[in-house]
């Protein structure tokens, strides 16, 4: 019934596209007039548009004319004219939606339309791609259009210095990778001045391969971390022990990707740990004193049994490198967290790097939700439309192709074993190769790629292998996969970003030439050869795409299919499956095996059956649903941290912008002073209950004050009066610092202390949240909702962090010392980095000028003394020693630390 209604009235997508086609006529009607403009007049349209926007016009008021201008500029500069369907794609992107356009439909050119239009506001546009190569390529090729129209273009790639990044981000349109954008956002929020930051405020982002970035990579947070304690030796010992376990010692669930020790496994591993003296003979692994070892054991178990080399990671140059399960690419600079990476390094017997502590992190889900306006484009998004709408509030519109798709998608062939499947694949490859038809074989892992490659080598069939191990050659290899007799094996084709042109890509081949006197001749020969090969390939049937097994996601399978049949080219696709494939074995084996038994499948025979196709689709839907729930759950938890992150980053920015740091200092000083006094002299308490001894200790610890006990002996003194005196004295102490150093220097010092203290407590807070998150799922056993528990405890931790911030900040302000000897007199403002260096030398050993306010409290301060070179110290003359650290050996030559010798009374 539903299908009949759709045929009668069309789908919602059909109606949207039909409406957009009516708008395209408005753009097309402007084309004749725009074409008559001179280059100078066409360029001046940008100035005209900006003037209109300044006078109150909106982007929607100028959208049709702006698109017509970009179309004409592209025709003149690049020789490319936007098709009507590309204009539709541009309108969809401008309106903050996702456009699904088939491979080869010119998504890169489509992005120029909304990028130009939105850049006219002067707030910047980010065009996001999945790797540096694509960012550089697109900024260079499409940048010609923007530059012609008077807009600036920037490109961000890994390893650029901040100055270059800042200039690129300040351009009207910036091409960048999703990783660099996320990391730059985190880095900016660790800087100490606004001038050091590279990013501008968020405005508009166009994401290429949007499904890859917002869905496939959604579960992988970007993390900036620093090293913690070195436990490499322990990882090595645990690895040796785990290797001795039997398969009966643990049980794993491949669907849920979990692994746990069995009862016999616990007994076995406790015995092994005891022999290695890692636990005492009379204790168990789960005894309180041994609980830290559980973490190491679990990660070693996962490393050996849930992660496979050349599938989940590869080892290159003595390093374990993560492979993106969706794209087959190496994830440069990424490491598994929670000790898993160290466990893998121990497993592969390479150098074990230190564990890292998180300093800052964010998921792509929360990073991209910062943009007020977000859009994206991809060849495959409709299958994930509900998730994109639910999480990012992005609608998906499928745009029809410019030319009709003539590709033939053949039915899957299912075999009983992997060997039979490979035999069938080999037979087809041989047939295509003999006829000259180019073949692209898609695999789901590097391991499978190399397995198939070795089979082809034995048969002496020349071929290219494209996977994470040869990332540098990726674009060139894939661009030539459409040549006559070409055989290309590739891991997942998601996000490759390079078209496969039948006959090959002449431009890329020409780029390989040396510019000698024969350059033009050789270039012409290449073009002629490619043109001839294109005819031969079309006659042979176009590109034949072979899938060696189904992926968990239908979308990834569709991306592989989409490599064939670009822009109306002929082509074929076919998937070969076996009961040994992971997806079949884990999710659909029982049902399909039953069908095969019923049908009486013989060795070497293939089967085509609608029930099997339905079972496979259900299995994929089941996995997709499971992964969606995992991403949604991750987001619910990450939103808790994201709310806190926003507060901290906003506060940090306010501190940096602040021209007067005294407000927070004074209010916090008063708050802590009251808190300390009331802790030891509670309101309404008797005098004999006052804890004056500990009050003195606490005031000394926080404010470096000496409390006059005689003050309490006055009969009429109250806790309120004591509080007022403490507050006033604290303010006076600070004023004495301003007199000693200058108010501007102190302002910068206080601001710097506040920023560094905030960074420290935030880092510790992230560490606490990580630990809370790891164990929170166990609350479900106590009939408690883990998410609610996480929210509650995360809020308590956040409050605790803010209290720690205040105390640590005040304590540091009242105890720090600046070594004036290392500061030039004219440099009153003092750069943060120089201040950091001087403060690090002295924070452990506060020393100040003597101060007495004439009140009953006096400060425990010393004269400001600079450091002296040890060789200039006279052991018999303490006045020549200068400032001595309390932990240094005493200059008198006694051999004792200074704090136990001449510094004992300080």
Swiss-Prot record:
Complexes and interactors: Monomer and homodimer. Part of the essential Sec protein translocation apparatus which comprises SecA, SecYEG and auxiliary proteins SecDF-YajC and YidC.
Superkingdom, taxonomy of origin: Bacteria
Gene3D superfamilies membership: Helical scaffold and wing domains of SecA, P-loop containing nucleotide triphosphate hydrolases, SecA, preprotein cross-linking domain
Region (Disordered): 834-887
GO BP: intracellular protein transmembrane transport; protein import; protein targeting; protein transport by the Sec complex
GO CC aspect terms: cell envelope Sec protein transport complex; cytosol; plasma membrane
Naturally occurring in which organism (per UniProt): Rickettsia felis (strain ATCC VR-1525 / URRWXCal2) (Rickettsia azadi)
Record's bilayer topology term: Peripheral membrane protein
Reaction(s) this enzyme catalyzes, per UniProt: ATP + H2O + cellular proteinSide 1 = ADP + phosphate + cellular proteinSide 2
Name the UniProt record assigns to this protein: Protein translocase subunit SecA
Regions of compositional bias (Basic and acidic residues) in chain numbering: 834-847
Assigned protein family: Belongs to the SecA family.
GO function terms (MF aspect): ATP binding; metal ion binding; protein-exporting ATPase activity
Protein localization: Cell inner membrane; Cytoplasm
Positions with a binding annotation for ATP: 86, 104-108, 499
EC number: 7.4.2.8
Principal subcellular localisation of the protein: membrane
Binding site for Zn(2+): 890, 892, 901-902
